[in-house]
Amino acid sequence: FKIDGQSEIKEPIGMFGGRLEANFHVVVGQVSSIKNIARCVKSSGIDFDGITLEPLASADAVLSREEKEAGVALIDIGGGTTDLAIFKDNIIRHTSVIPFGGNIITEDIKEGCSIIEKQAELLKIKFGSAWPGENKDNEIVSIPGLRGRDPKEISIKNLSKIIHARVVEIIEQVYMEIKNYGHEEQKKKLIAGIVLTGGGSQLKHLKQLVEYVTGMDTRIGLPNEHLAGNNSVEISNPTFATAVGLVMNSMEKRKNISVNKNQSEDEDDLENDDKDSNSIESKASQSIFEKFTEKIKTFLENAE
């Protein structure tokens, strides 16, 4: 933010000034896709309160404040897409959605091994590896044949080669986005490297392959970064990073609304003698963010 020409302000709330400026990271999407998501949620009997970009939700669950400050690239590998969010100085700097994820790897296995999708998914989960060099040529897995047909033998090394080819393609596209952000510049360098999350991040040897292709330090992000107590195995699974992040995001919004409401009530008590002044103060207290949020809510409510 910038207040009266003073730049590099991260939190303007509580400061005085006559002019507020800001640089925003705008995320856009297809209207039809957003409305379809809203309709799907509403049809299940759940109220639709808002919408958040997937990697931003995942980032809340798996990234530490120190990583966001140092500079980090979050890669969320889902079923249909691979999402990228880059943070530097605790500010979101770049986002991107790559239209390939775990499902395309399953499809490659299905076509390459001439098997059905269910078998391809099981092979990927149980025997899949992003690094084919570790597999021996004589390692074979046998899967049941269809409708009384003979079992089919699949080479583990060949399976890993199929997975490796597609994963390298996805990583290279993501790394291109990281370079487009300007990672190679000293001021924009991502000191904390890469954090992998999402269901696809559980692929064996993926971390090592990402480090090899990008040359950046990499870790697997689990959604228990900000959770207290003994977390269950299910919640600690990177598959649920986005879900945990959405819950955290919603709780933070409710907390901010509660704080703002209490502050408004205190101001009304202090300025109770001047009704005109109170009216002006009330209008001013509705920030541009609140107005924008109201418009989004109205748009989502009209999804049907």
Regions found by a protein language model. Name each.
Residues 99-123:
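A conserved active-site cap/scaffold subdomain adjacent to cofactor or substrate pockets
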Residues 93-94, 107, 155-160, 192, ...:
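Short beta-alpha connecting loops at secondary-structure transitions
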Residues 63-94, 109, 246:
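Gly/Thr-rich phosphate-binding beta-strand-loop-beta motif of the actin/hexokinase/Hsp70
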Residues 221-270:
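Glycine-rich phosphate-binding/hydrolytic loop that grips phosphoryl groups
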Residues 53-60, 104, 225-228:
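Short acidic loop-to-helix transition motifs that present clustered carboxylates
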Residues 29, 129-131, 187-213:
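Glycine-rich phosphate-binding loops at beta-strand->alpha-helix junctions
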Residues 171-192:
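Phosphate/pyrophosphate-binding loops at sites that engage ATP/ADP/AMP, CoA/4′-phosphopantetheine
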Residues 1-73, 116-118, 122-159, 259-304:
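Nucleotide/phosphate-binding catalytic cleft detector across ATP-hydrolyzing
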